[in-house]
């Protein structure tokens, strides 16, 4: 008898195979999950202990610190935003090839840049170089601020003057040169120089002629041409009239005081209505007034030591003490003593009060010779030049005379002015004495002084034609 084996049904076999496949998939998924867990566990820092783990943690920690100090590069926009938070001025070193825009704000005076202006300049290597700001005030010198300043240059080619604004500090540079070269140049001559322009024709205003020639009876013809503006020099100096005529054209181009007077602008309403600086006259006050300049008219002062100085005194200016050396013009005191008896003497200078007032306190402490003193603040500043407008005196101009070594100083009252040679050191000078007879005669006439001064000195004939 044979035994017959029974075969399984196909459904059952398929089911076993399915169960087997499902088990395999389950095991494979479990294996994958275990592997993923192992990978994640490897990524997580292990809590190890001991010396070895401490060293590992130290090494890992230093590496992370370096990564923090050197982060990944960011975009230029992000970097610039962070830099702007640090400083208000963006760096220009990152972009040296890009030009820097220059913005300049023009002022209202001659177009000069007096307002904001970029104070840095780009070098060739792309770096910035600091430049001084144009808004800083100009440098000034002691000589230009204390003593009478030199007038700014005027010429036919420069009708508006050099300054272009009512700034009194712009003639300071020339004043310093004149004062510094004063002793070096003047000491070479044995006689006095007529004006600053004789020794320094490019720096100051020469007087057309000396008062001595007028007082000796020499009168100019109104029909002849304007003479050279070089002051007459003594024969000992070695200069001839031909040399003066040759230098006339050059002097005209450099400076012409009468061209300045011809083109000086008229006084404004505010200047015309200024309150008089002097008190009213009293019964004891003389009827006529004589206005006198100080520097190079009555005295010559210097900050350099002068061996023949008549006196010296200190001046405190801007917290610094300076020593001033003074020479007195010959017959200075005799002239004042005589004129103070018949005139109301008024000192009118373009110098600073801190210097001039102290000098007068030494020369005339009781104000017996000079009744009143006026200083730079009483002058009218026109295009950087100080002009002595006699209207501020509050006196009758028909009985007022001014003596000054610079005719520009009395440009608004030319008929009231008597020019005099500038004095520096000549011990034989007699210009003050020569004026005494004429001044005494004006008082005796008791008339309007202006026609007599005009006929005697003829300054109007020196003005250029229209």
UniProtKB/Swiss-Prot annotation:
Please list the residue ranges that the record marks as compositionally biased, kind Basic and acidic residues: 63-82
Q: What class of enzyme is it?
A: hydrolase
One GO MF term: phosphoprotein phosphatase activity
- Protein EC: 3.1.3.-
Which parts of the sequence belong to the FCP1 homology domain? 283-442
The UniProt entry's sequence similarity note says: Belongs to the CTDSPL2 family.
Q: What is this protein called?
A: CTD small phosphatase-like protein 2
């Amino acid at each position: 008898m044979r035994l017959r084996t029974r075969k399984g049904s196909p459904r059952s076999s398929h089911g076993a195979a399915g169960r087997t496949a499902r088990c395999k998939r389950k095991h494979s998924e479990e294996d994958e999950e275990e592997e993923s867990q192992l990978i994640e566990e490897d990524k997580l820092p292990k809590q190890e202990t001991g010396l070895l783990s401490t060293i590992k943690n130290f090494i890992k920690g230093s590496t992370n610190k370096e990564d923090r100090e050197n982060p990944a590069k960011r975009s230029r926009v992000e970097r610039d935003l962070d830099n702007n938070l640090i400083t208000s001025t963006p760096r220009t070193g990152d972009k040296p090839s890009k030009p820097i825009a220059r913005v300049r704000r023009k002022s209202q005076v001659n177009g000069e840049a007096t307002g904001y202006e970029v104070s840095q300049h780009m070098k060739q290597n792309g770096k910035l170089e600091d430049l001084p700001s144009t808004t800083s005030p100009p440098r000034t010198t002691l000589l230009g601020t204390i003593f009478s300043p030199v007038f700014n240059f005027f010429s036919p080619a420069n009708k508006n003057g050099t300054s272009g604004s009512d700034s009194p500090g712009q003639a300071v540079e020339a004043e310093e040169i004149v004062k510094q070269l004063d002793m070096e140049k003047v000491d070479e001559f044995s006689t006095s120089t007529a004006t600053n322009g004789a020794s320094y024709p490019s720096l100051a205003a020469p007087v057309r002629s000396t008062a001595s020639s007028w007082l000796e009876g020499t009168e100019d013809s109104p029909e002849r041409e304007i003479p050279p503006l070089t002051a007459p020099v003594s024969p000992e100096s070695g200069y001839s009239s031909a040399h003066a005529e040759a230098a006339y054209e050059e002097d005209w181009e450099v400076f012409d005081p009468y061209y300045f007077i011809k083109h000086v602008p008229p006084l404004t309403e505010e200047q015309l209505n200024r309150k008089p600086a002097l008190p009213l006259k009293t019964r004891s006050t003389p009827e006529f007034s004589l206005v006198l300049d100080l520097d190079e008219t009555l005295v010559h002062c210097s900050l350099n030591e002068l061996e023949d100085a008549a006196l010296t005194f200190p001046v405190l200016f801007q917290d610094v003490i300076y020593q001033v050396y003074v020479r007195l013009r010959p017959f200075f005191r005799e002239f004042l003593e005589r004129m103070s008896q018949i005139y109301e003497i008024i000192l009118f200078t373009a110098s600073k009060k801190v210097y001039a007032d102290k000098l007068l306190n030494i020369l005339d402490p009781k104000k017996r010779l000079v009744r009143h003193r006026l200083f730079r603040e009483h002058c009218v500043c026109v295009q950087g030049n100080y002009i002595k407008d006699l209207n501020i005196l509050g006196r009758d101009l028909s009985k007022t005379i001014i003596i000054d070594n610079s005719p520009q100083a009395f440009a608004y009252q030319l008929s009231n002015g008597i020019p005099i040679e500038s004095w520096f050191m000549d011990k034989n000078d007699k210009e003050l004495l020569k004026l005494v007879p004429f001044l005494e005669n004006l008082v005796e006439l008791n008339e309007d002084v202006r026609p007599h001064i005009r006929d005697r000195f003829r300054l109007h004939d020196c003005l250029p034609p229209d």
